Amino acid sequence: MLLEFALWLGQDIRAFNVFGYITLRTVMAAMTALLISFACGPAVIRWLAAKKIGQAVRDDGPKSHLTKAGTPTMGGALIIIAIAVTTLLWGDLRNQYVWVTLLVTLGFGAVGWVDDWRKVVHRDPKGLASRWKYLWTSLIALAAALFLGLTANEPAQTELIVPFFKAVSYPLGMLGFVALSYFVINGTSHSVNLTDGLDGLAIMPTVMVAGALAIFAYVAGHAGFSKYLGVPYIAGAGELAVFCGALAGAGLGFLWFNAYPAEVFMGDVGALALGAALGTVAVVVRQEIVLFIMGGLFVAETLSVMVQVLYFKASGGKRIFRMAPLHHHYELGGWKETQVVVRFWIITIMLVLFGLSTLKLR
């Protein structure tokens, strides 16, 4: 929106042409989203508390979590609003990738909203039935995957790129591309949701990964940089750097209120949306494997749940972990909540740096 206005003014006042630079708009998007979160956060928290939209806590979980009962939840709506408003302000609204990513984020957020609303307002502990949750998120992910596949006009847009090697890729075909894209978008969404169990645990790694994906998006959308670094050139993908900047800024603003002891939780409305956003960006810029590396924390949390359930059924009631997801295992092992969170952040920093190194190590 502001881009079109600035370019119009730039016809007469050349100084406004600076807003055509993606790097500037990415920084401005991050700052705008951060300020929106700061400005609106207290009011959102007060409204959630007044409506008694509070978190329910599992009786069989760590005892330290019992004090969290009643903490306002569904605060992820604040993140989504900040991302949407900022992207509409600073993004190029003629770019199809911006709209696909934004609509996927809003769609997954809507599913999470219904799930949270049923849990905390209608006092339904199950929320939205799992089959319906996966059905709706699957439909949204498939719609995005099909759109991206059908509108691809270059082979690189649907190939699986192998990091650490120059010009090593595998053609997936339409069916393979749609299947992989569905798995990445839906899988990342639910992985972030599983990770969101401690104060600040999910949001900071999400911000880190989003920041790294902003770099990948900028490189992929720049003909010169993509050629030099051996990254497939995806025309228009650079605009997703602006979206990622908005996500990172909104996430940091939310962390201000979500840091221990949390004043608000993001709920499914935030976790599902943010995970889907990361997955969609990774699909567009063809960095699914790198997302798997940088989001290793999300992968580990998900695998811990899967392994726990499978082993429990196969062994007749035995468990590998004290409790799943993985962060609860360490809590019950004696780690304080803040120790788990900060140590998992450190691991994510290492993984993100390793993921970024794939740009040069080819």
UniProtKB/Swiss-Prot annotation:
MF terms (GO), sorted A to Z: metal ion binding; phospho-N-acetylmuramoyl-pentapeptide-transferase activity; UDP-N-acetylmuramoyl-L-alanyl-D-glutamyl-meso-2,6-diaminopimelyl-D-alanyl-D-alanine:undecaprenyl-phosphate transferase activity
UniProt-listed GO biological process terms: cell division; cell wall organization; peptidoglycan biosynthetic process; regulation of cell shape
The UniProt record lists the keyword Transmembrane: yes
EC code: 2.7.8.13
Pathway note: Cell wall biogenesis; peptidoglycan biosynthesis
Chain ranges passing through the membrane: 27-47, 73-93, 97-117, 132-152, 160-180, 200-220, 237-257, 264-284, 289-309, 339-359
Assigned protein family: Belongs to the glycosyltransferase 4 family. MraY subfamily.
Full protein name: Phospho-N-acetylmuramoyl-pentapeptide-transferase
Native organism: Aromatoleum aromaticum (strain DSM 19018 / LMG 30748 / EbN1) (Azoarcus sp. (strain EbN1))
